[in-house]
Structure formats: structure tokens, C-alpha cells
Regions:
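Active-site metal-coordination/substrate-binding segment of hydrolases
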Residues: 1-70, 74-77, 81-92
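C-terminal domain-closing interface element
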Residues: 89-104
Length: 104
């Protein structure tokens, strides 16, 4: 099971007027990183969602049974994951595609 979350935490610097529903993100490249000026980027786990969807869609890959789990509210209590019923997932291994190293 490939697991990732769908939601984003919209945050901005207090000195900036930005409406996350209507204003675009001002993204830029900084070395190997894509960053945003004055706001969160909004790509927190988007790469993991894209990865899971690409693996599921690619019929040329050889693999066993796959499933994807997309949750919400991982930052404020794991609401999406907590709502899962026991036995809903069939996989024996869950790959959490949203982790980071301490200090990163």
C-alpha cells in the first residue's frame, strides 16, 4: 500500500496579502529545491500522490497487487487515517510517502 495525504497547510508570512483560493503560488528554483516566496509551496505531499497514481497507471511495471491510500488532516490528528476500518487495506506493507529526516 502506498500512502500519502491530499491536503495542504496554507500558511503565509504575516506581511503578505495572499488568498490561497484565488492567488497563484510564487514558486522558484533554489538549487535542487522548488520553493515559494512568502507562502507555503502547496506541494507537501503532491509528489507522493503523483508517484502513486503513476505506478498504478503504468501497465508496463511488474509488481504484485498494489493499493493506494490517500488521507487528509495528518497534521492535526490523522483524521483520515483514524477513520479507516480494520481490514480495509489488504496489503501487508505500507509505504508512507510523507516522511523526513530530523533537521532536514
Amino acid at each position: 500500500t502506498m500512502q500519502s495525504h491530499l491536503d495542504m497547510v496554507p500558511q503565509k508570512n504575516s506581511s503578505v496579502k495572499h488568498d490561497f483560493l484565488t492567488d497563484p503560488i510564487d514558486a522558484y528554483i533554489d538549487g535542487d529545491w522548488v520553493k515559494a516566496r512568502e507562502t507555503t509551496l502547496g506541494a507537501d505531499n503532491g509528489m507522493a500522490v503523483a508517484f502513486a497514481m503513476a505506478v498504478l497507471a503504468d501497465k508496463t511495471l511488474t509488481h504484485g497487487p498494489l493499493e493506494a491510500l490517500f488521507t487528509i488532516n495528518e497534521e492535526v490528528g490523522m483524521d483520515g487515517a483514524v477513520g479507516l476500518k480494520p481490514g480495509f487495506l489488504k496489503g501487508e506493507i505500507l509505504l508512507n510517502c510523507d516522511s523526513e529526516e530530523e533537521g532536514e
